[in-house]
Structure formats: C-alpha cells, structure tokens
C-alpha cells in the first residue's frame, strides 16, 4: 500500500510518499480502507519531533473509511461499513479507565503519535475503536471528528463535570 511517512523530524519537506507493507489485522481488529485523514495539530508536533515517536512513522490521528475485512472475534462490524476510528488507546482496566478518565491511563496512547496513523491506504484498527458514521456525513466530515471530539468530551464530562439534564451553551455550532 501507499503511505505518507517521515524518516526524520522537520518541516513538510520530510514527508515521503512511499510503498509500505499492508497491515495484517489481528483477530480483534478490522482492516479499513482509509478514504479521508484530516490534519490535526498533533501531526505537526509529531513531524517536528515530539518525544516518544519511533521512525519511520506514519502520521494521522483522525481518519474515516470503509471496512474491508473483520477479524475472527469481531461480531458487530461488517465489511463495507463506513466508519471512523477513535484515536485513543488505553487499558480499560485501571482505576482511571474505570472512572471514565481514560486520557489519564498509564497505557494511554494516540494513533498517529505513539503508533502509526492513518495517512495510508489501509489501517488495522481495534474493533473497540471503530465507530460507524451516519449517512449524513461524508468521509471528509467524519475524519474531522475523532480527536477534537475526544478533547471536547473529556473537557465537558471531566473538567466541567456536566451531567444529564444540565443546560449548556454551544458557541460556533451550525
């Protein structure tokens, strides 16, 4: 498959478009044909040398596409389904995860940062991170959702501690 990778840190000139091996999904993963991957500021930080990134590296934390293959243990997703990928990985077992603050998990990572991202043709994603997208969103719109949604969600449910029934003001909605 084709992918955009970096082999060194720097400006846009370090981006290379090249052939890389197709990913092989595990039994608990799905293989996604990436149709859109949006640019997040995290991609720029990683490209410029964010600590903890192994090279070569594929950027891209926000992606959407369609499932082409499902692993043996995956029962709720199907080939052909249009999906986006929640870019956060966490253990889902520690006290922080159980409390709903997965972004504080010691095993917390972000796709496109600690692991290769979605600036590629095919991406193997854990089924628990895959979310079907409604027909009302195209792939470009869906790819703009993942990381910004998670950031907003954690601020609203964590810092602001909003609860069902409370009234909130949403600025900038359309």
Briefly describe each language-model feature range.
Residues 89-173:
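NAD(P)H dinucleotide-binding glycine-rich loop of Rossmann-like/cofactor-binding domains
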Residues 3, 34, 152:
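Terminal peptide-recognition signature
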Residues 42-47:
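Cytochrome P450 core scaffold surrounding the K-helix E-X-X-R motif
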Residues 4-7, 68, 123:
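Conserved hydrophobic/aromatic positions in well-ordered beta-strands
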Residues 12-17, 48-49, 113, 150-153:
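Short gly/ser/thr-rich secondary-structure transition/capping motifs
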Residues 21-38, 50-98, 129, 134-137:
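Glycine-rich beta-strand-centered segment in the early N-terminal region that forms part
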Residues 1, 81, 165-167:
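Nucleotide donor/acceptor-binding cores
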């Amino acid at each position: 498959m084709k992918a955009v990778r970096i082999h060194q840190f720097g400006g846009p000139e370090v981006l290379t478009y090249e052939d890389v091996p197709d990913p092989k999904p595990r039994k608990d993963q799905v293989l996604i044909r990436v149709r859109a991957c949006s640019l997040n500021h995290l991609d720029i930080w990683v490209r410029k040398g964010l600590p903890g990134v192994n090279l070569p590296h594929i950027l891209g934390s926000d992606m959407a596409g369609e499932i082409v293959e499902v692993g043996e243990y995956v029962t709720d997703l199907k080939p052909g389904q249009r999906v986006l990928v929640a870019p956060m990985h966490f253990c889902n077992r520690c006290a922080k995860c159980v409390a709903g603050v997965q972004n504080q998990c010691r095993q917390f990572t972000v796709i496109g940062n600690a692991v290769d991202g979605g600036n590629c043709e095919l991406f193997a994603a854990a089924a628990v991170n895959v979310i079907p997208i409604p027909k009302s969103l195209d792939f470009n719109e869906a790819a703009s959702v993942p990381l910004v949604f998670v950031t907003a969600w954690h601020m609203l449910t964590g810092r602001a501690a909003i609860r069902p029934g409370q009234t909130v003001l949403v600025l900038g909605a359309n």
